[in-house]
């Protein structure tokens, strides 16, 4: 499923290709969608490419090919399990402890800063400002420094990571193949994906067949942490 802006941009590009034989410029796209900056267009283009609707052709200016148009039929897809631990219930709160251990449990919990939102879908601008904290049992964290990000999007749903989940992240600048990571792309966009190496390149894999794998050179990707657990609100 596309957002309204993604659909509008895809429609505009497709119509321009049919009329003129060349795609519109980023300035024309920005004006057509009434956006303030071209960075918003860049994010929409990336989303359409990830989902397999368009392809950017290398070494050619303004080279965008429309591969398909939206299929209005739905496909929910199977949701498979996710191995890191999940605390379910009220967001940011563990289950009430028994009265005799209430004080001890409260003292043991760790306050983890929430640093903003992370995209499980379209890469979104990375936020570096702490907004609040959530209380996490220490045995869920292990060693190192940790932070939390609110998940936006559905590209990791088949790994059990859902829109609205709070992702618990261990700060790390490296990752092993198969890790689910916070990846910063081009120093401005953050996304939550499964990390793999493909030869000299890095693959950022979604866990949703509606999205495409992104293959990027290492100099465009910086690992900012690894997923170790989830908070989920019902």
Curated annotation (Swiss-Prot):
Indicate the enzyme's highest-level EC class.
hydrolase
Q: Name one GO biological process term.
A: negative regulation of DNA-templated transcription
What reaction does this catalyse? Hydrolysis of Ala-|-Gly bond in repressor LexA
Alphabetical list of InterPro entries matching this protein: LexA, LexA-like, LexA/Signal_pep-like_sf, LexA_DNA-bd_dom, LexA_repressor, Peptidase_S24_LexA, Peptidase_S24_S26A/B/C, WH-like_DNA-bd_sf
Region of interest (Disordered), residue spans:
80-107
Report the DNA-binding ranges. 26-46
SUPFAM superfamilies attached to this UniProt entry: LexA/Signal peptidase, Winged helix' DNA-binding domain
Molecular function as annotated in GO: DNA binding; serine-type endopeptidase activity
Where along the sequence does the record put site: Cleavage?
A: 120-121
Domain of life here? Bacteria
Q: What does this protein do?
A: Represses a number of genes involved in the response to DNA damage (SOS response), including recA and lexA. In the presence of single-stranded DNA, RecA interacts with LexA causing an autocatalytic cleavage which disrupts the DNA-binding part of LexA, leading to derepression of the SOS regulon and eventually DNA repair.
> What's the subunit arrangement here?
Homodimer.
Name the protein family: Belongs to the peptidase S24 family.
- PANTHER family, alphabetized: LEXA REPRESSOR, LEXA REPRESSOR-RELATED
Q: Supply the name of the protein.
A: LexA repressor
Q: What taxonomic lineage is listed for the species of origin?
A: Bacteria, Pseudomonadati, Pseudomonadota, Alphaproteobacteria, Hyphomicrobiales
């Amino acid at each position: 499923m596309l957002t309204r802006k993604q659909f509008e941009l895809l429609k505009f590009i497709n119509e321009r290709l049919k009329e003129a034989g060349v795609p519109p410029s980023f300035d024309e796209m920005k004006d057509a969608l009434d956006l303030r900056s071209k960075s918003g267009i860049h994010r929409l283009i990336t989303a359409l490419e990830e989902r397999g609707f368009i392809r950017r052709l290398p070494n050619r200016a303004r080279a965008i090919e429309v591969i398909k148009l939206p299929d209005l039929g739905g496909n929910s897809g199977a949701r498979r399990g996710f191995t890191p631990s999940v605390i379910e219930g009220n967001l940011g709160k563990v289950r009430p402890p028994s009265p005799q251990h209430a004080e001890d449990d409260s003292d043991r919990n760790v306050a983890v800063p929430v640093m903003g939102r992370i995209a499980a879908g379209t890469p979104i601008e990375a936020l570096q400002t702490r907004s609040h904290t959530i209380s996490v049992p220490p045995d869920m964290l292990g060693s190192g420094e940790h932070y939390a990000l609110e998940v936006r999007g559905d590209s990791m749903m088949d790994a059990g990571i859902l829109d609205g989940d709070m992702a618990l992240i261990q700060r790390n600048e490296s990752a092993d193949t198969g890790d689910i990571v916070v990846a910063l792309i081009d120093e401005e966009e953050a996304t939550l994906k499964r990390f793999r190496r493909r030869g000299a390149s890095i693959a950022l894999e979604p866990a949703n067949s509606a999205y495409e794998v992104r293959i990027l050179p290492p100099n465009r990707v910086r690992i900012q942490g690894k997923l170790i657990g989830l908070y989920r609100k019902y």
